[in-house]
Amino acid sequence: MHQLVLLRHGESVWNKENLFTGWTDVELSPRGEEESRNAGLLLKEHGFVFDLAFTSLLKRAIKTLWIVLEQMDLMWIPEHKEWRLNERHYGALQGLNKAQTAQEYGDEQVKLWRRSYKVRPPALAEGDQRHPSFDPRYHSLSRDLLPDTECLQDTVERVLPFWQQQAVPALQQGKRILIAAHGNSLRGLIKYLDQIPDDDIVGLEIPTGSPLVYELDRDLKPVRRYYLETGKAG
């Protein structure tokens, strides 16, 4: 049996302020730090140990991982930062208040941008300093890999090469893996693992700071999945 734990980062300051975040690199809120500590303690209390960890290039996920590993006394294990685990890019909506955006564009339009599988929000304008091409952490990547906006389908397609090229080989070697990432990048992994239809995955809610445990068979097919806090199926 192979062990995989997925963890959405703790609450960020922009989660708290109800702003579209995407690839904007914001801090954890005090509540998010506490959620991360609790997740680490919970994993430790239940006897979980990891050989390898993955996270995104965004500090709310990185710090969540660090806090969890510190609580588990596992700061020494290898960790890999993968841009493909970044949150969905919300384009020109990044930094805008969700409620105010709904007032300006209408609830239905914003709902489409947020919750449809294939509809992208407005893209960043050419030359917008928020574009990842201006960020040094992405300078090693080809320009055509960097999004100016994404729908959920784009995010899923971005995440799957990470799964096939990084996670699968490690799991096949018997590594126990923790992935600390974001709501939409984790949706991509969950959609693939559980074979969830396009129309259903958009409504899947993933709580912040709650470890989602997968027990996988030799073919890496889920045998059991549950949130550690409750023991109930996710």
UniProtKB/Swiss-Prot annotation:
InterPro entries with a match to the protein in the record: His_Pase_superF_clade-1, His_PPase_superfam, PG/BPGM_mutase_AS, Phosphogly_mut1
Keywords from the UniProt entry: Gluconeogenesis, Glycolysis, Isomerase
Site feature (Transition state stabilizer) residues: 182
Active site: 9 (tele-phosphohistidine intermediate), 87 (proton donor/acceptor)
Keyword Isomerase: yes
Involved pathway(s): Carbohydrate degradation; glycolysis; pyruvate from D-glyceraldehyde 3-phosphate: step 3/5
SMART domains: PGAM
Binding site for substrate: 8-15, 21-22, 60, 87-90, 98, 114-115, 183-184
Enzyme Commission no: 5.4.2.11
Catalytic activity: (2R)-2-phosphoglycerate = (2R)-3-phosphoglycerate
GO MF: phosphoglycerate mutase activity
GO terms, biological process: gluconeogenesis; glycolytic process
First-level EC class: isomerase
Matches recorded under Gene3D superfamilies: Phosphoglycerate mutase-like (3.40.50.1240)
Known function: Catalyzes the interconversion of 2-phosphoglycerate and 3-phosphoglycerate.
NCBIfam families in alphabetical order: pgm_1, PRK14115.1
Family to which this protein belongs: Belongs to the phosphoglycerate mutase family. BPG-dependent PGAM subfamily.
Assembly information from the UniProt record: Homodimer.
Protein name: 2,3-bisphosphoglycerate-dependent phosphoglycerate mutase
Organism expressing this protein natively: Citrifermentans bemidjiense (strain ATCC BAA-1014 / DSM 16622 / JCM 12645 / Bem) (Geobacter bemidjiensis)
Source lineage: Bacteria, Pseudomonadati, Thermodesulfobacteriota, Desulfuromonadia, Geobacterales
